């Protein structure tokens, strides 16, 4: 594997983690105010 491929995979992984994090918070709270309280 080249260094570029590893870098791209890492970025993809981080983006996926961030996205799943957002989805989890969305399930817990319905308004922005509630979301801020959860952080």
Curated annotation (Swiss-Prot):
Gene Ontology MF term list: toxin activity
Q: Cystine bridges: which residues? A: 29-35
Return the GO cellular component terms, semicolon-separated: extracellular region
Q: Where in the cell is it found?
A: Secreted
| UniProt keyword annotations, A-Z | Disulfide bond, Neurotoxin, Secreted, Signal, Toxin
Annotated signal sequence is 1-20
| Chief place of localization | secreted
According to UniProt, the tissues expressing it are described as: Expressed by the venom duct.
Sequence intervals crossing the membrane: none
Q: Tell me if Disulfide bond is a UniProt keyword of this record.
A: yes
Free-text note regarding domains: The cysteine framework is C-C.
* Role description: Probable neurotoxin.
The protein here is known as: Contryphan-Cal1
- Which species does the entry assign this protein to? Californiconus californicus (California cone)
Q: Taxonomic classification, please? A: Eukaryota, Metazoa, Spiralia, Lophotrochozoa, Mollusca
